[in-house]
Structures are given as structure tokens and as C-alpha cells.
């Protein structure tokens, strides 16, 4: 029996060697773009590029834009609940789990996403701008680019088996961390952990992309509002 809020997925058809090879090429190109922008600053921001690649690739290879994974879920209530629980887990990790690990490993912070967006306590314009970017560029752009596209293509390489999806999640979480290279080694590690939790929720909800999008948006919204109100630095 399916859980409410999830979509029943037919067992994936086996992929041909050619299809798997093409997915390997796509994943390699996507990963190279992430590194080229964030580490070497050799190409423009990777998120819009991955977003366009995702739209084109999914349309051509999977037949329709519906395959993107943003169709109407069976239950919005359950979808939002899963996203909210995911957000709570990520925020709790950020308070109690990753900081001691970061300290133990001797990792360093550079600057936070809030700092890069110019978010300041009591500044209404800065928080509105940050929230606008969060719910477009980050929540939709990053989740489609990283969780839907790169994770999907990485899993294709292993013929979309359950194990392949979880190995793909580890790989894409590492790339997601590198996507926040500007935050320093501590930021890379922390965002990789956050990306893993969001990605795990995505997989456990039977690849309901709304779970990842809403969780990502909720996490950033709570953090930004806390900074705006002075509850957090």
C-alpha cells in the first residue's frame, strides 16, 4: 500500500548500455560545471546551467516535462509534513551535530549564505530579497539541478537500482557541498550533510520533488527570519 502524499512509480525499465553511458556523460559534465564555477570560477553560476540541462534532458530522454517530478502529489498535507520534518532534522543537525564534527575535524568557516546575500538584522528589504532568492534560485533551482537531475543521472549509471540511488545521493551530496565552496571547508561539510538529509527525504518519499523543494525553502526561510529578528547571528 502506498503512503499518502507519494506517487506510485512503476518499476523502472532496464536501461540500455548506451543510455547508461549517456547518463554517465551527463553526470560528469554536470559535476565538472559545479567544480568549474565554485572552485575555479571558470564558468557562470552552475544552478541556472543545471536547471536548463535538466529541463532539456528530461524532456528529450523521459518524454515530457511531467517527468520533472513536480506534479500534484496525492496529499499536499502529507507532502508538507514530510518536508517540515526534514527541515526540523536539518536545523537540529545544524545546531547540535555538525558544529562539534566541524570543530573536531578542524574545518573553517568563510562566510554564510545569509552574509553573501547581504542579510542584516532588522533590514526588511534584505530579508525579502533573501526569501525571494531562496524560493526561486535555491528551493526550485538547486533541487531540480542537484536532486532531480544530477542524482537521477548518477542513479541511471547503476541502472536505477535502490543501491544506485543511495550511492548517487552520497555523490551528489558531495557536489552540493562543493556548490557552497565560498563558505569554506566547514560550510562545504555542513551543506553536504544538509543535502544528504534533503536527498534522503526525496528518495524515501518515492522521489517526490515537492518534498525537497519545500524542505529547502523552509530551512532557509527559518534561518533568514531568525537572523532578521535577531534570534540568530
Predicted regions and their residues:
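Residue-level signature of transmembrane alpha-helical entry/exit and packing/kink sites
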Residues: 19-27, 46-50, 75-83, 126-131, ...
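Juxtamembrane helix-loop-helix connectors linking adjacent transmembrane helices
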Residues: 67-138, 156-159, 231-233
Amino acid at each position: 500500500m502506498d503512503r499518502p502524499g507519494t506517487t506510485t512509480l512503476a518499476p523502472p525499465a532496464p536501461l540500455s548500455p548506451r543510455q547508461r553511458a549517456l547518463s554517465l556523460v551527463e553526470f560528469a559534465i554536470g559535476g565538472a560545471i559545479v567544480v568549474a564555477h565554485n572552485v575555479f570560477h571558470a564558468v557562470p553560476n552552475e544552478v541556472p546551467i543545471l536547471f536548463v540541462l535538466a529541463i532539456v534532458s528530461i524532456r528529450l530522454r523521459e518524454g515530457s516535462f511531467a517527468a520533472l517530478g513536480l506534479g500534484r502529489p496525492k496529499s499536499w498535507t502529507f507532502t508538507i509534513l514530510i518536508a517540515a520534518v526534514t527541515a526540523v532534522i536539518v536545523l537540529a543537525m545544524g545546531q547540535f551535530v555538525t558544529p562539534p564534527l566541524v570543530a573536531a575535524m578542524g574545518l573553517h568557516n568563510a562566510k554564510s549564505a545569509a552574509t553573501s546575500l547581504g542579510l542584516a538584522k532588522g533590514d526588511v528589504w534584505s530579508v525579502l530579497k533573501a526569501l525571494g532568492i531562496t524560493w526561486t534560485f535555491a528551493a526550485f533551482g538547486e533541487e531540480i539541478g542537484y536532486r532531480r537531475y544530477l542524482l537521477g543521472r548518477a542513479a541511471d549509471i547503476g541502472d536505477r537500482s535502490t543501491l544506485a540511488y543511495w550511492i548517487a545521493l552520497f555523490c551528489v551530496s558531495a557536489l552540493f557541498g562543493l556548490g557552497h565552496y565560498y563558505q569554506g571547508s566547514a560550510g562545504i561539510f555542513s551543506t553536504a550533510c544538509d543535502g544528504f538529509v534533503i536527498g534522503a527525504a526525496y528518495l524515501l518519499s518515492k522521489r517526490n520533488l515537492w518534498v525537497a523543494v519545500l524542505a529547502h525553502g523552509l530551512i532557509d526561510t527559518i534561518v533568514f527570519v531568525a537572523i532578521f529578528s535577531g534570534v540568530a547571528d
